Amino acid sequence: MSEKIRVLLYYKYVSIENAQEYAAKHLEFCKSIGLKGRILIADEGINGTVSGDYETTQKYMDWVHSDERFADLWFKIDEENQQAFRKMFVRYKKEIVHLGLEDNNFDSDINPLETTGEYLNPKQFKEALLDEDTVVLDTRNDYEYDLGHFRGAIRPDIRNFRELPQWVRDNKDKFMEKRVVVYCTGGVRCEKFSGWMVREGFKDVGQLHGGIATYGKDPEVQGELWDGAMYVFDDRISVPINHVNPTVISKDYFDGTPCERYVNCANPFCNKQIFASEENETKYVRGCSPECRAHERNRYVQENGLSRQGWAERLEAIGESLPEFVGA
């Protein structure tokens, strides 16, 4: 019988004195109750996703809320049948969201407690999606968008979040005078990014309050106008959002059939994220190219204990071969 697990997604921008010391204390408590997950703590706040059974997660929420700095912290809760994490990490970072402004010769970082976009609830955000005069901008990484996104949302031509400010500046003339609404997984990235857009001179900037995770749970909108699944940074990889008319938009890297199963290329020097069915992962030894499939450090081969002969037979079946220098 599977175990009933709760996954908690949360963040809060709040000044934390001695944040490094608090991170150590936080980790100690989490381990003492058997919680698992990943938490970032910085001078500017806290951002985390954790999982555990009902009793464990309730103890954690009560403990966090007992600190006056986090008394109103909003936990978004998913019910699952298995743990979303295998270990517990609490790390101190300079920022809970790194927008990369100072790294890329932009102005100083944004404080969302001082400057941020207008909060939109799920109903208001759905109305924005249907408004032809509103620009909807996805602020996540490209591989997150490719698994699922809001219908009609712009996919910036970027690899990761830190490249977004430059992309916006390069394309400013396309939507500077329009209403712009942004969204991300749980809201933490949009708090900072929408504030940056306001500072850049955009006159009408909104953000989906609570992120995609909240939109999918809203009893009125029920995730409608979301296509695909939502990428999450834990062992689940993806979660459903649209409970009205769900669709699969991502396609298997190898044969183009509908697929929402993300894997990393088995070549550790490539590590490209691709969609692949279990059948195709086996067939192509999880390699995204002939070079990766035949790489001497192919992780699929190592994980599954394939002999050199077995490996060669897999590749021969798809018209490829192992180079002579690959060891047994």
Swiss-Prot record:
| Free-text function comment from the UniProt entry | Catalyzes oxygen-dependent 5-hydroxyuridine (ho5U) modification at position 34 in tRNAs.
Q: What class of enzyme is it?
A: oxidoreductase
Q: What is this protein called?
A: tRNA uridine(34) hydroxylase
What the entry lists under InterPro entries is as follows:
Rhodanese-like_dom, Rhodanese-like_dom_sf, Rhodanese_C, TrhO, TRHO_N
CDD domains this protein is in?
Answer: RHOD_YceA
EC annotation from Swiss-Prot or TrEMBL = 1.14.-.-
Catalytic center at which residues?
C184 (cysteine persulfide intermediate)
